[in-house]
Amino acid sequence: MSGRSVRAETRSRAKDDIKKVMAAIEKVRKWEKKWVTVGDTSLRIFKWVPVTDSKEKEKSKSNSSAAREPNGFPSDASANSSLLLEFQDENSNQSSVSDVYQLKVDSSTNSSPSPQQSESLSPAHTSDFRTDDSQPPTLGQEILEEPSLPASEVADEPPTLTKEEPVPLETQIAEEEEDSSAPPLKRFCMDQPAVPQTASES
């Protein structure tokens, strides 16, 4: 009978764990990209932030000036800090995307900071910013443009490599002639089977 009680206990513990996990998932289910100020500095980072309700936004605005963690989240989000840190580590290299969206997001957040507008940004808008040279690029955009050039060159390399693979017959004949004028080591290796035969004959 003790086996049944142990199984029932583990089952109830598993149910409790599932409830906790589902509650945590429900808390962090909706994410949006936002400009977040880092601490007391004027540094702003464009990163994924969990969407908060309007009531929670008012609470966090009143609490954020007094208690703000170094990663930019209010202190009441410390319960999910391990989940948030893992998610941040995976997306920490997305600063290049933030530079492209910087102008659009700044204008939209100044007019109305609703999450629908920040979500409505699509990658189709990136071409508008890249082709628009009327405004001087920021430091991050200059860095963004430099790596994009080698990436396009790298993307062009595989087709050129596949095109160069078929070798014409003329070049093959030229290579065979070069092989005949190989260094003495190669000649010796080619002639090696003939050497034992002459030694066995004498």
Swiss-Prot record:
The keyword Transcription does not apply. It comes from the Eukaryota. Residues 53-202 are annotated as: Disordered. Residues 107-123 have a biased composition (Low complexity). One of its GO terms (biological process) is cell differentiation. PANTHER family: B-CELL CLL_LYMPHOMA 7 PROTEIN FAMILY MEMBER B, BCL7 RELATED. This is B-cell CLL/lymphoma 7 protein family member B.
